[in-house]
């Protein structure tokens, strides 16, 4: 028996015994193919099965299924002979409520939001030109290689990259991520990226861990959450300081390319030159206006003011000189009067006679008969005897 023969027998057996089955579960991964067919995985708490719903059947469905939807399917089990892979072929589909993963996600999201862990007030700003950047992800992941390749392509050599290896899938992933986060947060980094590439809802569910969310919230380092694809949302996206839709988008957000920096510098130089020329032109206009102002307005006023000041000074000097002249004239009159008085006294004193007795000036009442005296005037003197 060949593999083809075995697969065909198994296909016939499955389609015979597993026909018209009702299957319930949660979508953990889905592809809406361009051909119109839908391919998805349906899971419960322990297992999953690949499912397909072809275009002819899904046209009757009134909604587009998504990851996390809890569905009830009708259909049969079949096997694809070329690969030997069996799958459930759905012929009808309806929603059966929230899946367990989605319910857990929404409940935790609502509780943390009420506590304020998503409040924009607590979001830290990202650095403009980071020099120390940490990346928490699996060191063997394609996402890490894509990020490092993009950094190299951007030729951003200002930053040193620190890689912190952690599990990004499975039950042990939250603890591994928390340990890596604590280690990175103690290294005084400028920014930290928590990254993982795309995957199923179940694959990404470790980033919905409550303990991880609280560690992200209390970290002192600004954190970017870059998990899955643009349509994927996890709790770490809401509690982080910034959400990037993909790991590569986180690099685009954080790092300028060499060309971007050169263009920014050129633009800054151009703006500075425009500002410089504008300032110079303003100052030139100001100087020109001031020159005109002083030339046609202020200078004549200043000259007139100085002339008025000189006239006032001249008047003050003339007044002072006139006062001094009057003072000198009065003083001269006093001297002249004093001179005339002395001259009159001198002329009168020529007629006066001085009496001396024994060489001393004597008064008339002191003289006695027979006293010998000397009589003197300004022109002569005589000896005389008192009778």
Swiss-Prot record:
The keyword Protease does not apply. GO terms for biological process: DNA catabolic process. One of its GO terms (cellular component) is cytoplasm. Coiled coil: none annotated. One of its GO terms (molecular function) is exodeoxyribonuclease VII activity. Keywords: Cytoplasm, Exonuclease, Hydrolase, Nuclease. PANTHER family: EXODEOXYRIBONUCLEASE 7 LARGE SUBUNIT. Bidirectionally degrades single-stranded DNA into large acid-insoluble oligonucleotides, which are then degraded further into small acid-soluble oligonucleotides. Heterooligomer composed of large and small subunits. This is Exodeoxyribonuclease 7 large subunit.
């Amino acid at each position: 028996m060949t593999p083809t023969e075995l697969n065909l027998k198994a296909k016939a057996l499955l389609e015979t015994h597993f026909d018209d089955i009702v299957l319930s579960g949660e979508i953990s991964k889905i592809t809406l193919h361009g051909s119109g067919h839908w391919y998805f995985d349906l899971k419960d708490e322990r297992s999953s099965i690949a499912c397909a719903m072809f275009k002819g059947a899904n046209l009757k469905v009134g909604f587009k299924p998504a990851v996390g939807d809890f569905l009830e399917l009708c259909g049969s089990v079949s096997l694809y002979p070329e690969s030997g892979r069996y799958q459930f072929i759905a012929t009808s589909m309806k929603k059966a409520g929230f899946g367990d993963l989605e319910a857990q996600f929404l409940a935790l999201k609502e509780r943390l939001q009420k506590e304020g862990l998503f409040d924009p007030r607590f979001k830290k700003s990202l650095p403009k030109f980071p020099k120390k950047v940490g990346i928490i992800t699996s060191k063997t992941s394609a996402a890490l290689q894509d990020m490092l390749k993009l950094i190299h392509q951007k030729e951003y050599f200002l930053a040193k990259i620190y890689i912190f290896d952690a599990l990004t899938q499975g039950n042990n992933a939250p603890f591994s991520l928390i340990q890596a986060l604590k280690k990175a947060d103690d290294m005084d980094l400028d920014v930290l990226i928590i990254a993982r590439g795309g995957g199923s809802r179940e694959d990404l569910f470790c980033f919905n861990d409550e303990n991880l969310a609280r560690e992200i919230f209390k970290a002192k380092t600004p954190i970017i959450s870059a998990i899955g694809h643009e349509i994927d949302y996890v709790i770490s996206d809401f509690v982080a300081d910034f959400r990037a839709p993909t790991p590569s988008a986180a690099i685009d957000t954080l790092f300028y390319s060499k060309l971007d920096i050169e263009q920014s510098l050129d633009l800054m130089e151009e703006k500075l030159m425009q500002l410089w020329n504008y300032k110079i032109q303003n100052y030139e206009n100001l100087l020109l206006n001031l020159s005109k102002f002083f030339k046609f307005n202020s200078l004549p006023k200043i000259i007139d003011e100085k002339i008025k000041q000189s006239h006032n000074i001249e008047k003050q000097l003339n007044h002072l000189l006139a006062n001094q002249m009057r003072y000198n004239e009065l003083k001269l009159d006093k001297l002249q009067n004093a001179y005339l008085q002395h001259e009159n006294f001198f002329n009168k004193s020529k007629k006066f006679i001085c009496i001396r007795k024994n060489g001393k000036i004597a008064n008339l009442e002191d003289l006695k008969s027979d006293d010998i005296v000397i009589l003197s005037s300004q022109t002569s003197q005589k000896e005389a005897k008192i009778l």
